[in-house]
């Protein structure tokens, strides 16, 4: 077993990533969570944090790491991950990154995107273009100056649209050229987990029902009672934000909110798989049928 390897285990929400961790041998590996909501303290149920039982079987990092009022971002994740990797390598343990945030996996592999600073003059110019001409105009301009970035970007992500144009107007170089990076770590084993979509839909429905049965409503009432609200970064997670909508629209029934969580979760699964399918050199497995192959790949 090579102890200098780094393992990625990724897949969409509810695919069964945590389930396979119970089969890992104790003491030879630790998990680094790649999740933008599990990182927050107190937001437990809808984020589907690993159970106490699982965390006693294999240590998890970046779970219950941050207070809910603070923004979690790629920079924090990357910095903390590098420290954890270094520590685990000193202990001759395997770092295993587990989660569903494809954006974080991508930049852990290739490094943080680097682009030059932009002057306030250029920033104001692009923002004024957005105010006067709208998002579609900026998208068309991005298509003209950096088609590669235009094809890859979420076309509703106005922050990254503006940022891409700012870099181009500042330097005359497409931001896509700045984002091309070499692998930051050697010997990465990338394991993808997937199931048929009808199976995923059924698992999502069961998961949401289990959230309600486990006391999600009481957890949200408690969080609101502590002063957290829609401005709290942790409330952006699926399963939390829908209940904030319910609070502002009392005409909604509980079943409407449950159905909305299921719908949003399934749409998120589709977006996750679209992103994951673009990652190179991934070994894909069904988490139930291929467990032995997964274990051999990591630990043999």
Curated annotation (Swiss-Prot):
Entry GO MF terms: ATP binding; tRNA dimethylallyltransferase activity
GO biological process: tRNA modification
EC number: 2.5.1.75
Site (Interaction with substrate tRNA): 101, 123
Region entry Interaction with substrate tRNA, spans: 35-38
Cofactor(s) for this UniProt protein: Mg(2+)
Enzyme class: transferase
Residue ranges that the Swiss-Prot or TrEMBL entry lists as coiled coil: none
One Pfam family of this chain: IPPT
Residues reported in the UniProt entry to bind substrate: 13-18
Keywords noted in UniProt: ATP-binding, Magnesium, Nucleotide-binding, Transferase, tRNA processing
Domain of life: Bacteria
Gene3D superfamilies the UniProt entry points to: 1.10.20.140, P-loop containing nucleotide triphosphate hydrolases
Catalysed conversion reaction: adenosine(37) in tRNA + dimethylallyl diphosphate = N(6)-dimethylallyladenosine(37) in tRNA + diphosphate
Positions of ATP binding: 11-18
Described purpose of this protein according to its UniProt entry: Catalyzes the transfer of a dimethylallyl group onto the adenine at position 37 in tRNAs that read codons beginning with uridine, leading to the formation of N6-(dimethylallyl)adenosine (i(6)A).
Quaternary state and interactors: Monomer.
Family membership: Belongs to the IPP transferase family.
Protein name in UniProt: tRNA dimethylallyltransferase
